[in-house]
Amino acid sequence: MTRRLWDISPAVQAASPVFPGDTAYSQQWCATIGPGCPVNVSAITLSPHVGAHADAPLHYDADGASIGNVDLDAFLGPCRVIHAIGKGPLVEWEHIAHAVEHLPARVLVRTYGRAPTTWDQELAAYAPATVERLADLGVKLIGIDTASIDPASSKSLDSHQVIRRRGLRVLENLVLDEVAEGDYELIALPLKLVEADASPVRAVLRALA
């Protein structure tokens, strides 16, 4: 029996929202099918933070590992989706406490009723204390359906610094609009980009049974 899949990755295209000043997605055709050419070949340019992505420690730590040198285990396995819809600007412990019993090692928080298709300067982020408590419970990956686990205006990146210190991994820009609260299998592997500070992922959830 085939287990149901939920695609939790947004479409990546020229209109995909990016942090102000970041590199948007663009594509050009280097070759097209026609006389003397049997294939279409394109070149793409984008920030690795466009769409669903995994941050590497290098993104928030000058001496951190690049995404191509990060262990993959955290990005694959049992996961819990917790709803904190409309909560913010920070997701506090009280917003997720109803669903933290017997947590698996991966937690994704849904804050949007419907994910926006344009940049959201007022995005919801994790409160650093929430990340600390999740780490205390053995969580090794956190994710969110906004562009960052820190507020868009943050210069200190307090929640990123918690995951640096506690050794957690992170997924951002997920789409959880159609996902009920509960437990799933997460599959969200980053590319082996040897020197990059992040990587796009094709994030999916799979039913446990």
Swiss-Prot record:
GO terms for molecular function: arylformamidase activity; formamidase activity; zinc ion binding. Binds 2 zinc ions per subunit. SUPFAM superfamilies: Putative cyclase. One of its GO terms (biological process) is anthranilate metabolic process. Substrate binds at residue 19. The keyword ATP-binding does not apply. Zn(2+) 2 binds at residues 55, 160, 172. The active site is at 59 (proton donor/acceptor). Keywords: Hydrolase, Metal-binding, Tryptophan catabolism, Zinc. The keyword Zinc applies. Its EC number is 3.5.1.9. It catalyses: N-formyl-L-kynurenine + H2O = L-kynurenine + formate + H(+). It is an enzyme of class 3 (hydrolase). Its cofactor is Zn(2+). Zn(2+) 1 binds at residues 49, 53, 55, 172. Pathway: Amino-acid degradation; L-tryptophan degradation via kynurenine pathway; L-kynurenine from L-tryptophan: step 2/2. NCBIfam families: trp_arylform (TIGR03035). HAMAP family: KynB (MF_01969). Belongs to the Cyclase 1 superfamily. KynB family. Catalyzes the hydrolysis of N-formyl-L-kynurenine to L-kynurenine, the second step in the kynurenine pathway of tryptophan degradation. Homodimer. This is Kynurenine formamidase.
